[in-house]
Swiss-Prot record:
InterPro entries: Domain_X, Maturase_MatK, Maturase_MatK_N
Record organism: Trigonella foenum-graecum (Fenugreek)
Coiled-coil residue spans: none
Family: Belongs to the intron maturase 2 family. MatK subfamily.
Record key words, sorted: Chloroplast, mRNA processing, Plastid, RNA-binding, tRNA processing
PANTHER family given in the database record: MATURASE K (PTHR34811:SF1)
Gene Ontology MF term list: RNA binding
Alphabetized Pfam families for the sequence: Intron_maturas2, MatK_N
GO cellular component: chloroplast
Compartments it resides in: Plastid, Chloroplast
Claim: Protein transport is one of the keywords in the record: no
Reported function: Usually encoded in the trnK tRNA gene intron. Probably assists in splicing its own and other chloroplast group II introns.
Name used for this protein in its record: Maturase K
Keyword Transcription part of the UniProt annotation: no
């Protein structure tokens, strides 16, 4: 139990007790408004055009405490005639202030008291999106079952706020936070719809992103603890693990009770062949064990979300499939394990044997139809795939138009260069190339055929298909067979930290 006590003390040491006074500090809202600060965090700047006033921020907080709905109410208009300010603007400023105040004790890069070595160490945790695929290629060929899990969203956003209670023990801070949410975010309803959560996340991206990531981090901390110390106890006994405050004390008491009252001994087992991967709002659990243990973890997840986080989750949101028979989607790719069968002839003395060898290979395929839907949504083609022009870019110069298309093509090419089959990637590049030609023809008020005759189809946009080969030729010998082999193999770019918007569309 010593390791449990160390884990508990480490968790308690991170609790912060005095965050409320920071809400009334002017520099907090200056940081929220500053373009440079927003650029340093991985959230896009909201682009405020107005100047903020700390006096109005303090007045808003005072009015929330007074509950004067003649001045501020959930149904108020965006422009309050009494004060003459934009309520949405100041609600975003206050929400950014809340996010910054809570981020200060939790993110090392925001604290000036840390040593430089620790700051550098914190940035090493930022890893490429593509770093996960070599791991999957190495591990998934030895596994049998995969569980595709959709992380449920809370029925009420206040559940996300309540999770902070285990780490931040400042009652006035949470009282003010709830007043703000009920006054500005219309949280009076018992159940918050997914559309309302989406609207709130768009208006307050930084604040919502912090709350959601904290929710995911909290459930993963419990899951990883149970993963490292899994028990063979019955499922009904799992409910006592949910209350985090007395988590470890109850676990120790449970072991003592079962050891005294039951004849069979309590044993703990570790499962080294189980792997967990999370991306966006989904996660994947893969294992080599029998389906029984995968179903066990499925029920653990459901009871964890329902019993501890008050989040409704249905069993159909967790699918358990055999890797050799089903494919799953991950970060814009389709992945499945393919069985390669080969026959080897073996001869011993005068006897000849035919031995069948079965090997596994992870196939990583570019999904052509979702990408075409994404291109159609971005107005590069129609829903069936034929390219169309981009009239909104026609006001730019020819160089800017080509550069825009080339950057999109380069990003998609880098992201999908790890695919097993490049045919789908070539189709996407072909659509972008023709869309670029049609956009240029639209700008010059000409047909595509006339424009190609005047400009020369051989030289125009040739870099769309030759850039990758030119880059590889600078690194490797100029041998056609070498370039052909590199073009067929998977190339993972370990400097990709963000996925393209076209990749995120599902």
């Amino acid at each position: 139990m010593k390791e449990y006590q160390v884990y508990l003390e480490r968790a308690r040491s991170r609790q912060q007790d005095f965050l409320y006074p920071l809400i009334f500090r002017e520099y907090i809202y200056g940081l929220a408004y500053s373009h440079n600060f927003n650029r340093s965090i991985f959230v896009e700047n909201l682009g405020y055009d107005n100047k903020y006033s700390l006096l109005i921020v303090k007045r808003l907080i005072t009015r929330m405490y007074q509950q004067n709905h003649l001045i501020i109410s959930a149904n108020d208009s965006n422009k309050n005639p009494f004060f003459g300010y934009n309520k949405n603007f100041y609600s975003q400023i206050i929400s950014e202030g809340f996010a910054i105040v809570v981020e200060i004790p939790l993110f090392p890069e925001l604290s000036s008291s840390l040593e430089e070595a620790e700051i550098i160490k914190s940035y090493k945790n930022v890893r490429s999106i593509h770093s996960i695929f070599p791991f999957l290629e190495d591990k998934f060929t030895h596994l049998n079952y995969v569980s595709d899990i959709r992380i449920p969203y809370p029925i009420h956003l206040e559940i996300l706020v309540q999770i902070l209670r285990y780490w931040v023990k400042d009652a006035p801070f949470f009282h003010l936070l709830r007043l703000f949410l009920y006054n500005f975010c219309n949280w009076n309803s018992f159940i918050t719809t997914k559309e309302s959560i989406s609207t709130f996340s768009k208006r307050n991206p930084r604040f919502f992103l912090f709350l959601y990531n904290f929710y995911v981090c909290e459930y993963e901390s419990i899951f990883l603890f149970l993963r490292n110390k899994s028990s063979h106890l019955r499922l009904k006994s799992f409910s006592v693990f949910f209350e985090r405050i007395f988590f470890y004390a109850k676990r120790e008491h449970l072991v003592e009770v079962f050891a005294k009252d039951f004849s069979y001994p309590l044993t703990f087992f570790k499962d080294p062949l189980i792997h967990y991967v999370r991306y966006q709002g989904k996660c994947i659990l893969a294992s080599k064990n029998a389906p029984f243990l995968m179903n066990k973890w499925k029920h653990y997840f459901i009871h964890l979300w329902q019993g501890f986080f008050d989040v409704w989750s249905q069993p159909r949101t967790i699918n358990i499939n055999q890797l050799s028979e089903h494919s799953f989607q991950l970060l814009g790719y389709f992945l499945n394990v393919r069985l390669n069968r080969s026959v080897v002839r073996s001869q011993m003395l005068q006897n000849t044997f035919l031995i069948e060898i079965v090997s596994k290979k992870l196939d990583i395929i570019v999904p052509i139809m979702p990408l075409i839907r994404s291109l159609a949504k971005a107005k590069f083609c129609n829903v069936l795939g034929p390219p169309i022009s981009k009239p909104v870019w026609a006001d730019s110069s020819d160089f800017d138009i080509i550069d825009r298309f080339l950057r999109i093509c380069r990003n998609l090419s880098h992201y999908y260069n790890g695919s097993s089959k490049k045919k789908s990637l070539y189709q996407i590049k072909y659509i972008l190339r023709l869309s670029c030609i049609k956009t240029l023809a639209c700008k010059h008020k000409s047909t595509v055929r006339a424009f190609l005759k005047r400009s020369g189809s051989e030289e125009l946009l040739e870099e769309f298909f030759t850039e990758e080969e030119e880059i590889l030729s600078l690194i490797f010998p100029r041998d056609s067979s070498t370039l052909h082999r590199l073009n067929r193999n998977r190339i993972w770019y370990l400097d990709i930290l963000f996925s393209n918007d076209l990749v995120n569309d599902e």
